[in-house]
Design a protein with these regions (language model features):
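A helix-coil-helix interface module used to build multimeric assemblies
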Residues: 1-197
């Protein structure tokens, strides 16, 4: 089991059910790339401000890159017993590069780190979904253009109404998806406007 950061506050071992309840690793393992990206930017800032040495920054960045490579290749797996992804990265990094890994969190609370990770993850998912929506709209528009003469009934309040083309009906969905795309763009702009770095 990965070592809990807060274990020193207790004289007895914590019940495994409490550990299971407190663990967020199953959820936040999907944020590991964003966690390491945010940590890399934070380390760079610390070095630029003279808070850590350039050598420590280089070691941290190289260590984070090696963790990312090993995760991608399957050489390293996220420890399911780790309390959260942040602890896993910190402990893995410190095991690889030594004390420089412990200096990574200078001037940054865990809450700051979590807020950044969530925002970066949501932004990444938003961009991904926007790409899927754009591709779907393109496919719908192509099919609509191919069906400009295929007649079908239009519906008003679930009742058959005037005749329309199948292409026209498809374009209604393209229009709805375009509104969804605009909502994602707006949400992403709001995420970008208040980056917690």
């Amino acid at each position: 089991m990965a070592e809990q950061l807060w274990k020193g506050r207790f004289s007895k071992a914590v019940d495994s059910r409490v550990n299971d309840f407190n663990s967020s690793i199953r959820f936040d393992q999907r944020m590991i790339a964003q966690d390491m990206r945010g940590s890399g930017v934070h380390a760079t800032m610390l070095a630029k401000q003279g808070i850590i040495s350039e050598k420590d920054c280089e070691d941290i960045l190289n260590g984070l890159a090696s963790i990312a490579e090993d995760l991608a290749s399957g050489k390293l797996e996220i420890d399911p017993n780790a309390e959260d992804v942040h602890t896993f990265v910190e402990q893995t990094l410190t095991a690889r590069i030594g004390d420089a890994g412990k200096r990574l969190h200078t001037g940054r609370s865990r809450n700051d780190q979590v807020a950044l990770d969530i925002r970066l993850t949501l932004r990444d998912y938003s961009h991904m979904l926007q790409g899927y929506i754009v591709e779907l709209i393109k496919v719908i528009c192509k099919k609509a253009a191919e069906n400009t003469t295929a007649v079908m009934p239009g519906y008003t309040h679930l009742q058959r109404a005037q005749p329309i083309t199948f292409g026209h009906a498809l374009m209604a969905y393209a229009s709805m998806l375009l509104r969804d795309l605009q909502r994602f763009e707006d949400a992403t702009a709001r995420m970008d406007a208040q980056c917690p770095l």
